[in-house]
Amino acid sequence: MENDELVQNMLLELRRGVLSIAVLSQLGKEEYGYSLLKALSDKGMEIDQSTLYPLLRRLESQGLLQSDWRIVDEARPRRYYVISPQGRAVLTKLKREWSSMAETMKQMLVS
């Protein structure tokens, strides 16, 4: 495997782990899929729809999100997502662990 391909594979693994935390962190208020994509993109986290929607379904099946369908302004139905109480508890722990790992990695990469 060439170095570029190896790096791409490793970055993909790293990104997968980060996306769950990123999505949970943005669902403190209700969002539908496209508005969530935009919110993530505005903060520098680009994500494809083909990645986001399966992730939302998985997080909901794990009890970390709640969702419901709504029709707003005579438009087509949209599914709105919001973090659940269990999701908030999990996000709090993940954020704490993320901070600890980031600090550790910062120290390791500087030396």
Language model: regions and residue ranges:
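Short, Lys/Arg-enriched N-terminal segment that forms or immediately precedes the first helix
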Residues: 1-12
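Amphipathic alpha-helical dimerization/coiled-coil segments
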Residues: 89-111
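Alpha-helical DNA-recognition elements
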Residues: 58
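Basic, amphipathic "hinge/linker" alpha-helix immediately C-terminal to the N-terminal HTH DNA-binding motif
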Residues: 77-95
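Short, structured secondary-structure boundary patches
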Residues: 14, 69-74, 88-91
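N-terminal helix-turn-helix DNA-binding core of bacterial DNA-binding proteins
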Residues: 11-53, 70
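Beta-hairpin "wing" of winged helix-turn-helix
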Residues: 62-75, 82
